[in-house]
Every structure is written in C-alpha cells, then in structure tokens.
Amino acid sequence: MAAKEVVFGNDARVKMLAGVNILANAVKVTLGPKGRNVVLEKSFGAPLITKDGVSVAKEIELEDKFENMGAQMVKEVASKANDAAGDGTTTATVLAQAIVNEGLKAVAAGMNPMDLKRGIDKAVAAAVVELKALSQECADSKAIAQVGTISANSDESIGDIIATAMEKVGKEGVITVEEGQALENELDVVEGMQFDRGYLSPYFINKPETGAVELDNPFVLLVDKKISNIRELLPILEGLAKTGKPLLIVAEDVEGEALATLVVNNMRGIVKVAAVKAPGFGDRRKAMLQDIAILTGGTVIAEEIGLELEKATLEDLGTAKRVVITKDNTTIIDGNGAEEQIKARVGQIKQQIEETTSDYDREKLQERMAKLAGGVAVIKVGAATEVEMKEKKARVEDALHATRAAVEEGVVPGGGVALVRVASKIANVDVANEDQKHGVVIALRAMEAPLRQIATNAGEEASVVANTVKNGSGNFGYNAGNDSYGDMLEMGILDPTKVTRSALQFAASVAGLMITTEAMVAELPKADAPDMGGMGGGMGGMGMM
C-alpha cells in the first residue's frame, strides 16, 4: 500500500477551500443572461465553448491533491443538481462556494462546526417549505417558453420550440435533441405510436411515390410467435374479406408460405394486408405488443395465455384510424383503445420508471410511455459550425430539462429573487444555541449569492443590486438582460421550483460536510524510478589499422 500524506485542522481546510474557489470561480462566470463563455480544451478536435456549469466543472482536475479534493466535492454538487433537475448546476456551485467560505471563516473564529452545520440544515429545510409555498403552477405554453428561454441563456427561439414540442406531444411525451443539418432549429413531430420495424415485403407497398404502405381504418392483428403456416391465418382472412377492411399483422415474424400467400392475395386485391415484425426482443417485445393491444383495443394472441391463432376472431383484433409503414418504421395513428385502459397502462409504466435502477431501462420505459401518451418530438439543432452546434445543443438540453422540472413542481421568480424572498421569511427559525444561529445566518447570506453573481456578471455593483431587490417585495427583482427592475413573472423571468430547491439542498449538503472536515488524507507522489544506465562502449581490439 502506498504511503499517505495527512493534513489536519486549518491546514486541511485552507487547501480544500482553495480547490473549492478555483472550480467555483471558473463555473460562476457563466451565470445569468450576461454570463460569459468558458473554453474547454479537448484532446482532439476543436475546443468546446460552453456556458453550462456542469460541463465546466467536469473538466477541472487540480495538481495539488488536497485542493483537488475540495474541487471534486463541489463538482459533486453540480453533478447531483444536474442529475436531479437537469439544470441549476451553476446556481448550486455558487451556493456551495458561499456556504463553504462563510462556514470556514466561522470555524476559524472558534465556532463549533457541527452546530454550524445543524443551523445550515435547519435554514435549508425551512427554505424548501417556503419555496414550495412561493411556487406557482406552470401550465400554459407561454410560461413553458419563458422557462426554456431563461435556461437557454435568453435564447427565445429555443424556449419557443420546446413549448411547441410540449404542446404537440403533451407533458409526458418524449422530446429528443439531435444535431440538425440546417442553420436554424427544426422540430419534427411523430404523432401516434411509432416503432422501428418496417414492412416484411416491398410487395405490400401501395404508395409507390413515397415507397410506403398506407392503411386506412385497418384491423390490427397482434401475435406473439412466428407465423409460417397460412392455415393459421385463414379464419381471420376469410372474416376480413367480408368486411373489406385492410389488415396489419404484427408478429414475431411472418415467413415462408404464410408471407408468400399474403403477398399474392394483396397483389390480386383479394385482401389488403401488410405484415411487420414486432418491436423489441424477449420480455420487452411482449410488453410492447401489449402496449399496441391497449392502444388499438385488441388482444395479443399468445399461446402462453391459452389463445391460438386458428381460433382468433375479428373481436380479438385492434383497430386504428390509420397506419403508415415505411422500409424502417411503422406508425399507428389514432388507435381505438379505451381511454381508461391507456391511462392505466401509462400509470403502470410510470411506476416501473420510478422503481428501475437502470438508466437504459428507464429510457426505454419513458419511450414506451410517450408512445402511449401522445407521441415523440425531435428538436434538430441548427448552427453554422460544429463548435456552435455543440454549445447550442447543450443549451437546448438544459432548457428541456428545466421546462420538464417546471411542469413537475411549478415555477418561482427567477434571477435569484426567490432565494432572497425565502431568506427574509426564515430569519427567525428555531435554533438551540448561538453557533446554530450563526449557521442560519451563513445559509441566509449564501441565498443572496446567485443574485449577486448575476449582477456582477452583468457589470453591476452586486451590493447595490442586492439591497434594491431586498427592499422590494413579492416578485420584484433585477432583470440583468436589459438592466432594469420590475416584476420578474411579468418580465417572463422564471426558474423551475425543482431546480432552485435541488440546487440549495445539494449545495448545503456537501458544503456542510466540508465545514465539518478536520483531516484530509492523500497518496504521496511516487518517486520516479532511476533511468537505466547507458550501454557499455564498443568491443575491444577494434581500433583503426
């Protein structure tokens, strides 16, 4: 085991604080509408230019091991805020820096670190309650667009496109962000349920101009096995021929004689039919077939539940308004399933999302839920260069997370105002002693830090702005974008409650641990091994003649 270096007391705290300040100072320049960019060197390709706090934090590694420990702990604050709410990473970093700096001053002055931490924790718990009381519901598209705009560093086009996407696919719908090909942002919306399986034979195509199969008011047959014998399908096909309606078959596979017969019947116009493979594999395929069954009001024909294809009737089939099948995708539009059953299925998938520990499973479950709940929207980010594309894509992703958080827990006045208003209401929180009281004061001072930093980044005197805002009431605050004061909600400057709450809780949690640190342990640098000795001279007796 390698030898360790141990530092104690004030020496440890000074080193740790230096690391905290280096990382926080690099991150906090990005805060607010007039925040600056940070350029990150990449081992290959062009440097990355960003205003995303967590991206900056993740890049920072310090040479001094004790300073690096301080930096890594603040990095943890940014990462946790990002994981919980998807935004607010810079705010969380600014709050953590303020609490650590004030807290370590108090420890150096002889106060009890544990009581300071208890005071900070009490203040934060009271602040969270007040934040929830201050919160307002974020229901309409205008408010969603405003939240997106603020999170995307005052880029209105991003806020608007996210609001439009949410309007199209609903609050539960899946919205993904991709790199586009154009200069402007674009929005693609896939309505209905789409899955990545295309037609099994090009002979099913009935729209040669688009290379697609389009079925109007079709029946939908769902089978959880391979179909290779046409006799299994005959009862269904005979019943279908009488109705004159088209049929979509979704099965594990349709092959051999069964596929050939379907193709021939389709080409002759006896029955209008198309077949696709079921999406997914294994248990996920069974679940997705059940999703389609609920969406279309049909039944999955599966032998494990005692249903046989030969005995299936038209009552077992689902129906939809329209189905479009391309080479790669199948889209079922306006399935005729019962609304209550669809809602119940969505609720069931929601429960699974909460319980799963796998990110991959969570993503797939969210996709399934979105396909049932409304659809999928794809925001294609446009930019002139690759460097701009990466920076803009990161902002769109942040804004998307912020709007989701706003829909979930509501919004509070932005620009750091919410924390200032909350601080004024919790000044008299109950404490056991003077040191705990000072812990509360530390938390209250820290809650002003985001507002002060926004003002500093805008080139204003932080103390003047902070005092002006504190002397106001309600939603009155400072708009750094146009250097004016007024009602933050009316000016459209909103922060998601969840983002503000998460930033405060994670900052206080990690900062409290740092204040109570008394020793730090790190590996000593390994001594370099000596270089190999040089080779000996040439062979003897080889002199020149």
From Swiss-Prot:
Gene Ontology biological-process annotations: protein refolding
What one GO molecular function would you report for this record?
Answer: ATP-dependent protein folding chaperone
The record ties this protein, via Gene3D superfamilies, to: GroEL, GroEL-like equatorial domain, TCP-1-like chaperonin intermediate domain
A Gene Ontology cellular component where this protein is annotated is: cytoplasm
Question: Could you confirm whether the keyword Chaperone appears in this record?
Answer: yes
Kindly give the Pfam families that the UniProt entry links to this protein.
Cpn60_TCP1
- Keywords (A to Z) from UniProt: ATP-binding, Chaperone, Cytoplasm, Isomerase, Nucleotide-binding
Enzyme class comes to isomerase
What binding partners and quaternary form does the record give?
Forms a cylinder of 14 subunits composed of two heptameric rings stacked back-to-back. Interacts with the co-chaperonin GroES.
Give the family per the record. Belongs to the chaperonin (HSP60) family.
Q: What does this protein do?
A: Together with its co-chaperonin GroES, plays an essential role in assisting protein folding. The GroEL-GroES system forms a nano-cage that allows encapsulation of the non-native substrate proteins and provides a physical environment optimized to promote and accelerate protein folding.
Q: What is the protein name given in its UniProt record?
A: Chaperonin GroEL
Q: Which organism is it from?
A: Shewanella amazonensis (strain ATCC BAA-1098 / SB2B)
Organism phylogeny: Bacteria, Pseudomonadati, Pseudomonadota, Gammaproteobacteria, Alteromonadales
